[in-house]
Amino acid sequence: MKTRLFNFTKWWLTGFTQADGGFVVNFDARKQGNLPYYPRPSFVLTQNIREEQMMIELHGVGKLYYSRNEINIVVRSQDDITNVIIPHFDNYSLRGHKLSSYFLFKEVVLMMNNGKHLSPFLQILELCYFTNHTTRRTLDTKKAILDKIYNKFGFVQFEPIIESNLSKPNSNPINNDYMVGLVDGDGSFNFGFKSTRRRIVPNFTIVQGVEDRSVLEDVQSYLDCGKVYDLQSQTSRYQVENVTDLVEKVLPEFKENKFNTTKKDYTL
């Protein structure tokens, strides 16, 4: 395997996480301990196996896991999340829905650091059980957890945490390193075929979940070109097809070719 040089920066990691990272809180059953379930926060980065070399180089805290054609960096240690992950994203902020997911995740970790008794667990469950828009969790699976809690302790009164009351600073302005990370994860440089006059049309695209449409609108403002479309697959797409915009606005943004994925091999 040819050795590659990588250019990991703080803002690149944030952009890359915006594309292919996630903040997850699982609720695991346990046989021992006071509570029948416990929350387990995880920070996850996922890539196709072809990016194995990059992920191995990027890997610091956490562990590497392989799943079919994917490689994942998963950080579950509460100390690593508290001392490495949270300080990073506090200083190099995400955008849109993923920023909101991060703040819920952070709130859960801080609550776990401050106490592990019953009321915080119920607050955590109420706060983040349905955070992930693609979750398979249902009201029935949530009820099953609550039933086990109430069967053991009886009905417990607790004060729910309102997400809108959490302190969320504004995102920093977009910069080049963030853009490179975002495109490394969710961007592409393609050629399309137009039926009219059988034209070949180059295009630059970035795709996000529809809940993060605002991120693409920020990119549109940053590059001062392109359009944002909502697709039927619950995703939104930012696209630049105008050749003048591609040459004068998009290509100069990436002229230094600081990509860390195999997009570095693309000819821009």
Curated annotation (Swiss-Prot):
It holds the Pfam family LAGLIDADG_1. Gene3D superfamilies: Homing endonucleases. It is found in: Mitochondrion. It is an enzyme of class 3 (hydrolase). GO terms for biological process: intron homing. It comes from the Eukaryota. Belongs to the LAGLIDADG endonuclease family. This is Probable intron-encoded DNA endonuclease 1. The lineage of its organism: Eukaryota, Fungi, Dikarya, Basidiomycota, Ustilaginomycotina. The gene is hegI1.
